[in-house]
């Protein structure tokens, strides 16, 4: 069971050995079916500004300083993941979640890193409307409903 970054390393190494050297690596996971061309182009533009590793991110409504908790296994008590004196969500630092719209990196960044976080990564903010990451059945059903609704709108425009 390899993690995604290890799979990228393997794919890049295999491609170099079997196809030849190349400059850039991009991953567009199928778990982000709501991605748009413009969101991918936005990542490419940021990558083109001499950023060797770019990933898409979106603002999250969850925050380790305010509403993410850890539950004790013995007594079910809860505590903040990152204890703080913040009492209002508006005062909490802005937090982003990586979303699989696009991952773009120089080939050597993938090969040389020991793990995903071993070096600088630039986050490109994308809208939460397209940031669905299908991890479970509910995510799938949500994405399916959005796509069906978009298709119905397109059909109305054609008629």
Task: Label the model's feature ranges.
Residues 14, 46, 146-149:
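Active-site catalytic microenvironments for nucleophilic, acid-base chemistry
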Residues 123-125, 129-159:
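Hydrophobic helical membrane-anchoring modules
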Residues 30:
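Helix-loop-strand module that forms the ligand-binding subsite of alpha/beta enzymes
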Residues 16-26:
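Short acidic donor-binding loop at the edge of a beta-strand
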Residues 9-17:
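Short amphipathic alpha-helix with an adjacent loop that forms part of the alpha/beta core around
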Residues 1-10, 24, 33-126:
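Conserved core of the sugar-phosphate nucleotidyltransferase
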């Amino acid at each position: 069971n390899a993690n995604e970054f290890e799979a990228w390393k393997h794919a890049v190494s295999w491609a170099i050995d079997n196809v030849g050297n190349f400059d850039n690596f991009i991953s567009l996971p199928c778990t982000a079916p709501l991605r748009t061309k413009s969101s991918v182009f936005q990542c490419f533009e940021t990558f083109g500004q001499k950023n060797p590793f770019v990933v898409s991110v979106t603002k999250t409504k969850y925050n380790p300083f305010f509403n993410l908790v850890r539950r004790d296994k013995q007594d079910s008590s809860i505590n903040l993941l990152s204890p703080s004196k913040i009492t209002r969500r508006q005062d909490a630092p802005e937090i982003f979640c990586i979303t699989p719209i696009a991952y773009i990196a120089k080939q050597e960044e993938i090969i040389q890193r020991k793990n995903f976080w071993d070096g600088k990564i630039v986050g490109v903010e994308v809208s939460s409307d397209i940031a669905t990451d299908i991890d479970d059945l509910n995510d799938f059903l949500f994405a399916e409903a959005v796509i069906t609704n978009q298709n119905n709108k397109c059909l109305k425009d054609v008629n």
